[in-house]
UniProtKB/Swiss-Prot annotation:
Its EC number is 6.3.4.5. CDD domains: ASS (cd01999). Disulfide bonds: none annotated. InterPro entries: Arginosuc_syn_C, Arginosuc_syn_N, Arginosuc_synth, Arginosuc_synth_CS, Arginosuc_synth_type_1_subfam, AS_cat/multimer_dom_body, Rossmann-like_a/b/a_fold. Belongs to the argininosuccinate synthase family. Type 1 subfamily. GO terms for molecular function: argininosuccinate synthase activity; ATP binding. One of its GO terms (cellular component) is cytoplasm. L-citrulline binds at Y96, S101, N132, R136, S185, S194, E270, Y282. The keyword Nucleotide-binding applies. Coiled coil: none annotated. This is Argininosuccinate synthase. The keyword tRNA processing does not apply.
């Protein structure tokens, strides 16, 4: 395969490296096209699974990297990115819990930190020119390291398919476990796993069983429900079934509990940031339980106006995270607005897991505004129903005046 004209001026590049076909090809391509620059591979451990990390360093070095940095970000990812985001109530287009989107800023931040540590003058990613991730990564790079050059091979090289990449590696005697028969494009982290490609590209096709890898088919889930209890403090899950856990531990435990019940599957056609629509299947078992529990406590503790404001913050935050604008003043502002409400989101929730559903069935909070004495339809001593008459007259005053004016 033809090699493009060599580019000069780049001495050391930090590549966001996964060990997959794309990034394995990027390493030799960078050396050939950027004046034999030094390549430092960087992998973020955001909970994608130990099996994805085994042999990664050896693979990177065999492909031509001078070193490989694997950075453990699992706890930080959940504590500083996932928890603050779900505390806002952010959910993209009503269904997507932003699993891929939330991971990009912490990965980009860690990549920049590695670049500073090794004295690199460029950053590289393997995102395609059609997707959201190129914007997310480069938006973060612009905010954190505007002085570093960004290299996006998919926007430069003439390779267009897996077959092209495999041929490229074969010509250079670089071994890879990838094959041309890979069906789906997947991205996993502690929060979720996404699936795209294959038969999913036709929205008339129902996802086959082989699409799903994290959760049990709800039809095959247990015939008996399971109940899980979550303790919530300041809109963060701190205990699961009475056991105090770190943010990452809590998520892992909920994943293990909810996945066998088929909880957290969605199949959506979303509006990408770059203008096109794409179809994706997502599995977010533990996150779905967390999200439901937080909303259940909010129902108890937030008054009407606060709830409306939280919904506005949630909608704006969902688009901001999806669009890759984490490191912005607006994100800081939205998170601060959310935290002022989060101080009231304390309580305990019991969630029923059954055949793909996660339904809060019990909830209580020391900050609850719900009063059985006020809400009862029976006789009570704290609410005089006659008082409602004056309220209704004032509440409907504008309607009454409008009616008089139209006579």
């Amino acid at each position: 395969m033809a090699i493009e004209n060599s580019k000069t001026g780049v001495k050391k590049v930090v590549l966001a490296y996964s060990g997959g076909l794309d990034t394995s090809a990027i390493i030799p391509w960078l050396k050939e096209n950027y004046d034999n620059c030094e390549i430092v591979a960087f992998c973020a451990d955001v909970g994608q699974g130990e099996e994805e990390l085994v042999g990664l360093t050896e693979k990177a070095l065999a492909s031509g990297a001078s070193e490989c940095h694997i950075v453990d970000l699992k706890e930080e990812f959940v504590k500083d990115y996932i928890y603050p985001t779900i505390a806002t109530g952010a959910i993209y287009e009503g269904t997507y819990l932003l699993g891929t989107s939330m991971a990009r800023p912490i990965i980009a931040k860690a990549q920049v930190e590695v670049a500073r540590k090794v004295g690199a003058d460029a950053l590289c990613h393997g995102c395609t020119g059609k997707g959201n991730d190129q914007v997310r990564f480069e938006g973060c790079f612009a905010a954190l390291a505007p002085d570093l050059k960004v290299i996006a091979p998919w926007r430069e090289w003439d390779m267009e398919s897996r077959e092209d990449l495999l041929a490229y590696l074969a010509e250079r005697n670089i071994k890879t476990s990838a094959s041309a028969t890979k069906i789906y494009s997947r991205d996993a982290n502690a929060w979720h796993i996404s699936h795209e490609g294959g038969e999913l590209e036709d929205p008339w096709n129902e996802p086959s069983k082989q699409v799903w890898t994290m959760t049990v088919d709800p039809l095959d889930a247990p015939d008996e429900p399971e109940y899980v209890t979550l303790k919530i403090e300041n809109a963060r899950v701190t205990e699961v079934n009475g056991e105090a856990l770190s943010p990452y531990q809590a998520l892992m435990k909920l994943n293990a509990i909810a996945a066998p019940h088929g909880v957290g599957r969605i199949d959506i056609t979303e509006n990408r940031l770059v203008g096109m629509k794409s179809r994706g299947c997502y599995e977010t078992p533990g996150g779905t339980v967390m999200f439901a529990a937080l909303r259940a406590v909010e129902e108890l503790v937030l008054d009407k106006s606060s709830r409306e404001w939280r919904e506005q913050v949630a909608a704006r935050m969902a688009h901001l995270v999806y669009d890759g604008r984490w490191f912005t003043p607006l994100c800081d502002s939205l998170l601060a607005a959310s935290e002022s409400l989060a101080t009231m989101v304390n309580g305990e929730v019991v969630v029923k897991l059954y055949k793909g559903q996660a339904v809060p069935v019990k909830k209580r909070s020391p900050n609850s505004l719900y009063s059985e004495a006020f809400a009862t339809f029976g006789q009570d001593s704290v609410y005089d129903q006659k008082h409602a008459e004056g309220f209704i007259r004032l509440y409907s005053l504008a309607s009454r005046i409008r009616a008089y004016n139209t006579k």
